[in-house]
Regions:
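Beta-propeller domain segments
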Residues: 1-16, 59, 71, 133-134, ...
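Conserved loop/turn at the beginning of each blade in beta-propeller domains
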Residues: 19, 29, 74-77, 97-110, ...
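Predominantly a core beta-strand signature of beta-propeller blades
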Residues: 22-23, 88-92, 154-159, 272-275, ...
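Structural WD40 beta-propeller signal
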Residues: 29, 39, 115-119, 174-176, ...
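Blade-loop segments of beta-propeller domains
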Residues: 34, 60-120, 125
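Hydrophobic core register within WD40 beta-propeller blades
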Residues: 36, 114, 173, 284-287, ...
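Short coil/turn segments that connect the beta-strands within blades of beta-propeller domains
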Residues: 43-45, 122-123, 177-178, 297-298, ...
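Asp-box/WD-like beta-propeller blade repeats and closely related beta-sheet repeat scaffolds
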Residues: 96-117, 128-176, 184-188, 202-215
Length: 549
């Protein structure tokens, strides 16, 4: 729709790396890739790339408006899987395209992850998808699912269906000891259904344990007065109510083990045996098990995306965080504090107070005053950020580390020995920060570069008798001050690095979602303002390959 972006993947990569590493383009011209998996060994392997389809709520990202129709195999806004050989030549696909008979991925998307049960050795290929993307109607509620996909034909077999879906769907996958684990993001931004949730039509969050609500309600409209309790349908006020574990207010039913803002798991041999492994997160998007000989062994490393300035309980400046999930000895999930603790600090801390933004409920006109005239109403009614719960359901686990607000934790992987070259040490982690979507002001003040749109390195230092220390540093990013690469002519670098996985060859494969016009006024796009925000530009996705020299 007449939007353009600077994008030229034929240029030499502009990515800044430590000495001793090199970056190249493995695959380009992709449509919003989110996941990657490998099959084979170092001498011969295949690369499976998941294209997510319609992943963001914009008028331009609409699979139904594609000239060939929703079920056109070339529709860039529906999910699929592409298969490449180890040299980057496409050998199969698109696989799993939605069909009129209901086969393949769900057409609205997004699809988030793909993974083989046995890693590069194969086994069943699993994927996650939903109809979450539009955020505008009840049809996306409980639409998330986990399926298996035939890696040759793309034939789908649903494994677990009707999982919670709202602001965040079912996301990344991991496997261990006969169980499949997945990240199940919260259905709301901060525990309350607001106008940002399909005008209030989307489902409320589902707790993993019995909870008691606080006396607080959260206002979406002043006239008429509309307010909502946490973990409740839009406009329902129930101060002090007890919400039982796994109660889905949209269906009115309890489904054992199914909740959100959580890490869930199910037996591979019995998909109906679902358990909550860990909870109290907003969006625990990125998950990865450490090697068995790692200092973090026994836990699950989780990258969490923090709260936004939007909705009925807006916040500002909330950091993203790196957490370690461990199920309690009695089989109950451990708890990490959401929705009332942000990186272990109380939500009422002044640093998290909203400043007023165009996505806040009290700035939606009608029924409220438009932005920025609404700011006094936000400051009068949404400050401080009040508690959703009367008290935590159990002791709160603190994060291992925090990252910049809105930097967006989206991918984690542990380095293989072949990647260990200074400054990378054995047992280190690479993680991706996708970057913000413009709900708040940039998380850094110029000339300092904004945090995000990059890959970072964590080394774990453990000296006998001393606590484990995390050493975090930049690893791969665009030249200083550059965010998404498409904003600068003649720059060939990251736009939205969304995932990272190590291949059988020992190299890091970084999944770059591509160019996205964000919510900020500094959109960097050429095109009619009515087309934005959150416009996806098909064909700008890239798989980057980073290797030791």
């Amino acid at each position: 729709m007449d939007n353009t972006a600077n994008f030229n993947p034929t240029l030499p990569p502009s990515i800044v790396l430590p000495p001793g590493f090199t970056a190249s383009v493995f695959a380009q011209g992709l449509n919003q890739p989110t996941g990657i998996a490998f099959l084979g060994n170092s001498s011969s392997f295949q690369v499976f790339v998941l294209e997510s389809g319609h992943g963001l709520p914009s008028v331009c990202n609409d699979e139904t408006l594609w000239p060939g129709g929703v079920f056109d195999i070339n529709n860039p806004f529906t999910p699929d899987i592409l298969v490449f050989n180890q040299n980057g030549t496409r050998i199969r696909g698109p696989l799993g395209k939605p069909t009129s008979t209901g086969g393949g991925f769900q057409p609205s998307g997004p699809a988030i992850d793909i993974a083989f049960v046995n890693g590069t050795s194969g086994g069943p290929l699993f994927t996650t998808d939903s109809n979450q993307s539009t955020h505008t109607h009840n049809g996306n509620n409980n639409s998330s699912r986990i399926s298996t996909v035939n890696p040759m034909t793309g034939q789908f077999t649903p494994f677990i269906t009707n999982l919670p879906t709202g602001d965040h769907p079912t996301e990344q996958l991991a496997f261990k000891d006969g169980w499949i684990y997945w990240s199940q993001g919260s259905t709301t931004n901060s525990g309350v259904v607001g106008l940002d949730n399909g005008g209030g039509a989307n489902q409320s969050d589902i707790p993993c344990q019995d909870i008691t609500l606080s006396q607080n309600v959260f206002i979406s409209s002043l006239s008429p007065f509309v307010a909502t309790s946490g973990y409740s349908p839009f406009s329902k006020q129930q101060p002090g109510a007890t919400i039982p574990a796994f109660f889905n207010s949209f269906t009115g039913q309890v489904r054992q083990g199914v909740c959100d803002g959580a890490i869930l798991r199910a037996q591979l041999s019995n998909s109906s045996n679902i358990q909550a492994f860990s909870w109290g997160y907003r969006n625990p998007y990125a998950i990865r098990f450490p090697p068995d000989d790692h200092p973090l062994a026994g836990g699950l490393l989780v990258g969490v995306d923090g709260e936004d300035e939007r909705g009925a309980r807006p916040t500002n400046g909330v950091p993203d965080r790196l957490e370690l999930a461990r199920q309690n000895p009695d089989g109950s999930p451990d708890y990490h504090g959401w929705p009332d603790r942000f990186a272990f600090l109380p939500s009422s801390q002044a640093v998290f107070n909203p400043v007023g933004g165009p996505a806040d409920d009290l700035c939606q006109s009608p029924p409220n005053s438009p932005f920025p005239a609404c700011i006094p109403d936000v400051l009068a009614n949404d400050v401080p950020v009040a508690d959703v719960l009367a008290f935590p359901p159990q002791q709160i686990t603190a994060p291992l580390a925090i990252e910049g607000a809105d930097s967006s934790f989206t991918g984690i992987d542990f380095v293989p020995d072949a990647f260990v070259t200074d400054p990378v040490r054995p047992g280190a982690v690479l993680y991706t920060l996708e970057g913000d979507f413009g709900f708040s002001a940039p998380n850094a003040t110029p000339p300092a570069p904004e945090i995000g749109h990059e890959v970072k390195l964590v080394n774990f230092n453990q000296v006998s008798g001393s606590p484990l220390a995390l050493r975090i540093q930049n690893f791969a990013r665009n030249p200083s001050g550059m965010e998404q690469a498409f904003i600068v002519p003649n720059l060939n670098g990251f736009n939205r690095p969304l995932n990272v996985r190590f291949g059988p060859d020992g190299c890091a494969y970084v999944v770059d979602y591509g160019a996205v016009r964000d919510l900020g006024t500094d959109s960097h796009f050429v095109g009619p303002p009515a087309n934005g925000p959150l416009v996806q530009i098909p064909g700008t996705g890239v798989i980057w390959k980073i290797c030791p020299m």
